[in-house]
């Protein structure tokens, strides 16, 4: 929350929502009843995530894609936070970061990457942020489904 002062989407509420004045969209559904109802309805495309993101002006998603796939094909993978040591309080040792497009637009990565570089420089020893190859923006993200 120190580096991104805008709404964000997650699928595991936690530190990102602590003392955060900006909206946190919980795609898993614990903190968002609409997401909970959609997920309870069974398998869905990633379109519902894009719709909720648009409704809440979300431009950054930080998620465990294995938990919530398929990811909207319009979302651009910008990087991955690799946690140090054994995962204790989270289900996996990495968090994927996606640029989320505005309604009818393309995902904007320039400002986001600059802010993520500042964030990456602040990480403790052993924790790494790996940036995606943004020259491959047209390449489908690995968790995308039509």
Name each model-derived stretch.
Residues 1-6, 10-11, 15-23, 27, ...:
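C-terminal luminal/periplasmic domains and tails of membrane-associated envelope-modifying transferases
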